[in-house]
Amino acid sequence: MSALPEEVNRTLLQIVQAFASPDNQIRSVAEKALSEEWITENNIEYLLTFLAEQAAFSQDTTVAALSAVLFRKLALKAPPSSKLMIMSKNITHIRKEVLAQIRSSLLKGFLSERADSIRHKLSDAIAECVQDDLPAWPELLQALIESLKSGNPNFRESSFRILTTVPYLITAVDINSILPIFQSGFTDASDNVKIAAVTAFVGYFKQLPKSEWSKLGILLPSLLNSLPRFLDDGKDDALASVFESLIELVELAPKLFKDMFDQIIQFTDMVIKNKDLEPPARTTALELLTVFSENAPQMCKSNQNYGQTLVMVTLIMMTEVSIDDDDAAEWIESDDTDDEEEVTYDHARQALDRVALKLGGEYLAAPLFQYLQQMITSTEWRERFAAMMALSSAAEGCADVLIGEIPKILDMVIPLINDPHPRVQYGCCNVLGQISTDFSPFIQRTAHDRILPALISKLTSECTSRVQTHAAAALVNFSEFASKDILEPYLDSLLTNLLVLLQSNKLYVQEQALTTIAFIAEAAKNKFIKYYDTLMPLLLNVLKVNNKDNSVLKGKCMECATLIGFAVGKEKFHEHSQELISILVALQNSDIDEDDALRSYLEQSWSRICRILGDDFVPLLPIVIPPLLITAKATQDVGLIEEEEAANFQQYPDWDVVQVQGKHIAIHTSVLDDKVSAMELLQSYATLLRGQFAVYVKEVMEEIALPSLDFYLHDGVRAAGATLIPILLSCLLAATGTQNEELVLLWHKASSKLIGGLMSEPMPEITQVYHNSLVNGIKVMGDNCLSEDQLAAFTKGVSANLTDTYERMQDRHGDGDEYNENIDEEEDFTDEDLLDEINKSIAAVLKTTNGHYLKNLENIWPMINTFLLDNEPILVIFALVVIGDLIQYGGEQTASMKNAFIPKVTECLISPDARIRQAASYIIGVCAQYAPSTYADVCIPTLDTLVQIVDFPGSKLEENRSSTENASAAIAKILYAYNSNIPNVDTYTANWFKTLPTITDKEAASFNYQFLSQLIENNSPIVCAQSNISAVVDSVIQALNERSLTEREGQTVISSVKKLLGFLPSSDAMAIFNRYPADIMEKVHKWFA
């Protein structure tokens, strides 16, 4: 019996039935009625109750199915009155008694005899009524446990389906009671139940704490034992589904499979080699093998079979190209230069690339080359082709080994450039392009005479268009890292052949030729002037043709013309600049569609022209900037979608789908990507034009940069917005020359927003950008530009960032983990970068508050001290840098904090880690330089330790040089500050003098050569002794030549050295200089003239 009035039931039934009508008009009326009359604050409870009853009890399967789907959709939908579309749900806002009624109906329907498809939909609806933010529902768990014992497999499958969505239903139950449930599911006679059980098991596994994982390990053999039966029975889909679940488990706990790893390798090998299976089964088997390398690389390296198997199966899959097309006729005629339709081949390439990146050449190169040597001599062209593509895929990951074998690799590859089969030629071009990137710039310097002629030979009309295009693309890779001097001898041949490609009747060939010419021009720089007069008129002629069908070609022409202009310089470009600008203005004013590729090319071309013309570009800003402002003001285009729609949306590159609070949210990412591009271009114009851009600053800041920090669904938008802020401020300052009221107001809004972001930003990479923007903004605004409230908020933000970083690093670097390996090098890198930016932001605040910030810093001192006492070098270095900054900018005011860090700092002077020694030495130096009274009792006693640092046998090695030079500068600072108070000062001075030259650390060099100059001026016998003058001169010349000391900074010491040389006979002075080669002597004449 219904809980609703008959009239409500009758009205809503008519609406739901109308939803099933084939008549669009009837459906539209029903949708409107439901939306306007029932999805309201007053009626949503009636509607959800009705839909639950119909899903559970209606004998009309169409009405029941529609009701279940609508119920789930509306349960997830945010209430009409809610402003939190993504977080709020109707199901959590209805009254408890209504929720209880709905739950009762759905559960009764689930347990009754219903069609299998209806029960599936009911299980999805039930799952939405048991989310963790709803009251407990103990009856459900008992019902599911009973259903899992049912003789009807659909009951069992649907029960596991619910547990998949809400695994926490059983996490509170004793694990020993749960194990038999999954054991039974894994051995179920029904394939669908097995799959549902495995999927539910993964969800349950994710919910459990690590301490319980070992208890689940006993189930894994049963899970894996289900796989051979699927294979034997030809159940490809089931096999793929279980592999997908296993992949999730491997990503969580790879070492849980350690004892079964050999069996997994053998079974996946069998599946991948079985070409009778559908591609999804084979590719998911390969993915399972691949994720082991990404999550347990050491386990893979220690297994003899893993590398051999992985290499063998990927090579086999890479031969699966041009099936039933031995001459590759279809491939040759295809205009689509991607090979993604060759699914197994594409998966294999990606897999080998990923595994190589994780395991490296020491492990993978040997098994790979064992097969490659055989394959390149095979009579089967597919094997020769696969060998080339495999080498391309593995090159980056194996670079540690292969970069030393370039001649041998080229001996193997280059003969195949003239292979009879075009796909092998293509593969050869691919290798040459790939290694030109992966082994750059070394390979450009050492092998240009082999690579460039080989690629140029494939640009000729004797080759197929696909090969010509790929050779041209490989030349882009080579040019990107080649100097103009390397390219110059080949330019005639390159340009002659590329101009021929421009005459091709195939659009994609023309487009690639233009891209290659553009990159070569960019690399060749002024060497390209010779070809300017031939190429620029050709490009302009293409741009003048009014044809909307070749917008990409026009875009490539713009790109090419502007890159050539940039290469040859403003003066030469002037000959055609006005003509090109007129064409671009006409295109800008034409009706270009939103999704036309020409729009992006046009925007980038204007940016390059601005780089060429500088301030002469300003008159064009009213034409160029308004469209960018429109794109940059785009809002977040998001929408709630059904789970069934998610796969469709994910097929489109313009959209992304994320899951938040059980909801599927579609994000129109292409709009946001365009927004980022527009913001980056605005940043480019602002950087180039400074004060000339000031007219746009207020609008860009208030309508683009600051609102972008709230774009929580696109990291790039937030990063671009934060980066824009200090650049906009500098434009306004450049225009006015003073800090006017508008500038101060904008800074206050921007800095408050950035500081607030330090607390709320979830991504460490973006937090890093916020700190960087604060530092750059403070540089623009100067002293005391943050209020007391902002300083307090900044301190809280830094504290939160440090706490989060520390916890992340503890999680990754904790004690041995029996389930995972510590492999998060990328995350370490991110955290190191973040800590570096926090160091800079703390320093900026300390510097501009004249020590006033010290009292705020005391609030985060406990966290800094935790870092200081940790064993992780990154954390210790962060703390040491903070200490150095607080002494530099706080000076004698730091006396009260002295005892909190000095014992650890002096201990760090003898650390085995050179980076820590460097930071500690720097601190001792700033103690003497900025707070000599407070730290005299620290600095003088450390002199002997500092001398040991600069004097030990490996002190001048590359890895130790920075720490040595900082210790050297610290000695100089102590000698300068405490000269008369130091016993044996001349001995220490002599020891210091032996540390010169200082050629790596610019800050250390600056002080060391100031001190050297002072010693000379004071006629110190240590440096002024005739026997030492040659060493003095040499140390100064080396510092200037290595640019650790700029010519401007070096004027004082150069002047002192000249004075010192004046004491020598001119012949002796010239003898000192004459030992230098001609290139250095040319500089010496300039420095010492």
Swiss-Prot record:
The modification Phosphothreonine is found at T830. Its main location: cytoplasm. Keywords: Acetylation, Cytoplasm, Nucleus, Phosphoprotein, Protein transport, Repeat, Transport. Pfam families: HEAT_EZ, Importin_rep_4, Importin_rep_5, Importin_rep_6. InterPro entries: ARM-like (IPR011989), ARM-type_fold (IPR016024), Importin_beta (IPR040122), Importin_rep_4 (IPR041653), Importin_rep_5 (IPR040928), Importin_rep_6 (IPR041389). GO terms for cellular component: cytoplasm; nucleus. GO terms for biological process: mRNA export from nucleus; protein import into nucleus; regulation of mitotic nuclear division; regulation of protein desumoylation. Functions in nuclear protein import as nuclear transport receptor. Serves as receptor for classical and arginine/glycine-rich nuclear localization signals (cNLS and rg-NLS) in cargo substrates. Its predominant cargo substrate seems to be ribosomal proteins and ribosome biogenesis trans- and cis-acting factors. Required for nuclear transport of YAP1, NOP1 and SOF1. Mediates the nuclear import of histones H3 and H4. Mediates docking of the importin/substrate complex to the nuclear pore complex (NPC) through binding to repeat-containing nucleoporins. Interacts with Ran (GSP1); interacts specifically with the GTP-bound form of Ran (GTP-Ran), protecting it from GTP hydrolysis and nucleotide exchange. Interacts with RPL25; this interaction is dissociated by binding to Ran-GTP. Interacts with YAP1; this interaction is dissociated by binding to Ran-GTP. Interacts with NOP1; via its rg-NLS. Interacts with SOF1; via its cNLS. Interacts with histones H3 and H4; via their NLS. Interacts with ABF1. Present with 15500 molecules/cell in log phase SD medium. This is Importin subunit beta-3. It comes from Saccharomyces cerevisiae (strain ATCC 204508 / S288c).
